[in-house]
């Protein structure tokens, strides 16, 4: 079985911690993964994998995390044809209700526009926010985590989502 490549960026450590938990859980389930901090990785490295997990928190007012922002131009030019990816991100649905999880949308939409298949959608119903670029009907384009207001739900959400994407990846 081919490995899954996980690429993430983090300023405060929340996204890094979630990525580490997710990797540990997936590997405990027999899924082989490689993990990359996007701060130290050329985005073209993603093209070496057929399956990706991409993690990015929403930063400031609806912006990408610093390292993702730095490579975003190059990311948007990649051809993701034949690649399947799941997205997850941290946000604050109370303090930033008008742009909750926007980073998932900022990364997920160009991924699909450039030929990629997006999996791992997550229902919006458990969240209280006003607007999100990650929203697609009654789903987000990926898993939303809110350690600022619902930290007690983070591990449970990660486990449920990991089981979902394992099935969707076919692993």
Q: PLM ranges: what are they?
A:
Residues 30-42:
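A short beta-strand-loop structural module common to alpha/beta enzyme folds
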Residues 9-13, 40, 58:
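Short, surface-exposed acidic/glycine-rich loop or hinge patches that mediate macromolecular interfaces
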Residues 1:
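Iron-sulfur (Fe-S) cluster-binding modules
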Residues 4-6, 36-39, 71-74:
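Short acidic/polar alpha-helix capping motifs at helix-coil junctions
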């Amino acid at each position: 079985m081919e490995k899954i490549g996980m690429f993430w960026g983090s300023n405060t450590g929340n996204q890094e911690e979630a990525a580490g938990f997710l990797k540990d859980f997936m590997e405990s389930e027999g899924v082989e993964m490689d993990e990359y901090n996007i701060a130290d990785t050329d985005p073209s490295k993603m093209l070496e994998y057929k399956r990706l997990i991409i993690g990015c928190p929403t930063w400031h007012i609806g912006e990408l995390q610093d390292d993702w922002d730095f490579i975003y131009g190059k990311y948007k030019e990649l051809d993701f044809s034949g690649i399947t990816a799941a997205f997850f991100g941290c946000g604050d649905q109370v303090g930033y209700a008008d742009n909750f999880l926007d980073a998932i949308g900022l990364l997920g939409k160009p991924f699909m526009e450039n030929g990629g298949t997006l999996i791992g959608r997550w229902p919006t119903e458990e969240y209280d926010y006003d607007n999100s670029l990650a929203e697609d009907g009654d789903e987000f384009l990926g898993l939303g985590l809110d350690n600022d207001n619902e930290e007690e739900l983070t591990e449970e959400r990660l486990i449920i989502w990991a089981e979902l994407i394992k099935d969707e990846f076919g692993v």
